[in-house]
A protein has these predicted regions:
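DnaQ-like (DEDDh/DEDDy) 3′-5′ exonuclease domain used for proofreading
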Residues: 1-41, 45-65, 70-74, 80
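N-terminal [4Fe-4S]-dependent radical SAM core
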Residues: 5-35, 42-43, 210-261
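N-terminal pre-triad scaffold of radical SAM enzymes
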Residues: 34-40, 58, 250-276, 300
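Conserved SAM/AdoMet-binding glycine-rich loop
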Residues: 36-37, 297-439
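Short hydrophobic segments within beta-strands
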Residues: 37-39, 69, 105, 141, ...
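Glycine-rich beta-alpha loop elements in corrinoid/cobalamin-binding modules
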Residues: 71-222
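Iron-sulfur (Fe-S) cluster-binding segments and ferredoxin-like electron-carrier domains
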Residues: 275-291
Length: 439
């Protein structure tokens, strides 16, 4: 039946699974089944580093089978609904109800309807209060878990903060309680109380939240004893010891970020007022260079990818960036592996850094002024020196780059018309420098 369906949809590679480096787990022999759900298309979800990390962590546990669910595209969804066929996992073609957990990555608010759609297509009651022991426990994590209340009716648990350690503690609690829970000897609320002892876990049904007339939280208190009065955000203290996937899954179709992603740091030392990511990933931590090189070497040998992206909120603030680039270039000098960076701060490219990057990849560099006037940059607390930026842009063009990308935000508080006009002016200045260099 699946082969018949795949002949009728665009990009059937989204639904076949069986990628290179896929862990071989026997679903039926696993004591605990975890559905890892990403509420968007396959090619977006497989570009998400968090999904890859949690997937590797859980499948490294001998008694756990972690399998992936992604939102189907509209053509696939229509066929599944017309045939009254539920959504299924990529690995074993199992339905969502056959799992102990359904864990959702909540990356942005626009995916919330996809969360509900996946639950509905998996024949799971949407409201947590309607789900007994026969249904999977629904967990939410990721950036949007910082504000869980809009989804509190639908989730049994939220994991506030970073999941690498906490998910193991959740699994360990469930491992010890599963038989009693599934036999209805243990009530669901009692199990949730046990989960609430894990730092970072918020079980909405254990708390009462009151709102004022404007919809803001007025009071937050526990309904029962034995649960934390406040939920603390969970974070890793040592990024060097954090698990990272070495057996990088290689999809059969092109995905959004079709390369190896190396997380070299987490958190950010800057304090831009517009940024949600800084409090989400606070405090600032970095990996040691030797650790990064080992991860890069392992990922390359297991994949053959010819591009690696250094990942972090502000990679240019990584101390030792120049040394890291030199050693990465030396490591892969015989393999033609290119190294790419996200948006960089101009001052980080002073010296040899821009030339190093240009020696391995000249497709483009990205800068993020965010606002084109100094007045507005001060309001959002964006550290960006215009004179320094223009000098670096000229240096970048001299290094061999032909394209740079500039990020700006529109709609900031206290924005004026002249702030928008200045975007054109700043972009033109950068363009004129390229013309000057190329004369």
């Amino acid at each position: 039946m699946l082969d018949d369906i795949l002949l009728q949809v665009n990009k059937p590679g989204r639904y076949i699974g069986r990628e290179w480096n896929l862990p071989r787990k026997d679903f039926d022999k696993a004591d605990i089944k975890f559905a890892l759900c990403f509420p968007d298309l396959y090619e977006i979800g497989m570009s998400n580093l968090g999904i890859r990390i949690i997937y590797a962590i859980l499948n490294n546990l001998p008694d756990v089978a972690c399998e992936r669910f992604f939102s189907p595209a509209s053509d696939m969804e229509k066929i599944l609904r017309d045939r009254n066929t539920g959504i299924y996992s990529l690995e074993s073609r199992k339905g969502l109800r056959e799992f102990d957990f359904a864990g959702f990555s909540l990356g942005h608010e626009l995916s919330y309807t996809n969360v509900l759609n996946i639950l509905q297509m998996g024949s799971i009651p949407l409201k947590a209060s309607l789900r007994d022991q026969s249904y999977p426990l629904v967990i939410g994590g990721g950036p949007c878990a910082l504000n869980p209340e809009p989804l509190c009716e639908f989730f049994d648990l939220f994991l506030i903060g970073e999941a690498e350690e906490a998910i193991l503690e959740i699994i360990d609690i469930y491992r010890k309680a599963k038989d009693r829970f599934k036999a209805s000897v243990m009530k669901k609320q009692d199990l949730l109380v046990m989960f609430s002892q894990v730092e970072g876990v918020y079980a909405p049904s254990l708390y009462e939240v009151r709102y004022d007339s404007a919809g803001k939280i007025e009071e937050f208190q526990a309904k029962t004893g034995g649960v934390p009065a406040k939920i603390k955000k969970r974070f890793l203290k040592d990024l060097n010891s954090a698990p990272f996937p070495s057996d990088w899954l290689i999809p059969y179709i092109q995905i959004v970020h079709d390369r190896i992603t190396l997380e070299i740091m987490r958190g950010c030392p800057n304090a831009c007022r517009f940024c949600q990511a800084r409090p989400q990933y606070f405090p600032f931590r970095k990996r040691e260079i030797d650790n990064i090189l080992n991860l890069a070497d392992s990922a390359y040998k297991n994949t053959g990818y010819e591009e690696m992206s250094l990942c972090g909120l502000s990679v240019s603030d990584f101390s030792g960036l120049e040394e890291l680039l030199k050693r990465l270039i030396a490591l892969f000098k015989e393999n033609a592996v290119s190294i790419s960076l996200p948006s960089v701060r101009p001052k980080s490219l002073i010296g040899d850094v821009s030339a190093l990057i240009a020696s391995i990849k000249k497709t483009g560099l990205t800068f993020a002024p965010e606002a084109a006037t100094e007045r507005l940059r001060k309001i959002i607390n964006k550290d960006f020196n215009l004179e320094e930026f223009l000098k670096v842009v000229e240096q970048v063009y001299l290094s061999g780059y032909q394209n740079i990308k500039l990020y700006f935000m529109i709609g900031l508080p206290f924005e004026r018309e002249e702030d928008l006009d200045a975007i054109i002016g700043l972009s033109t200045q950068a363009l004129e420098l390229r013309k000057k260099v190329n004369k």
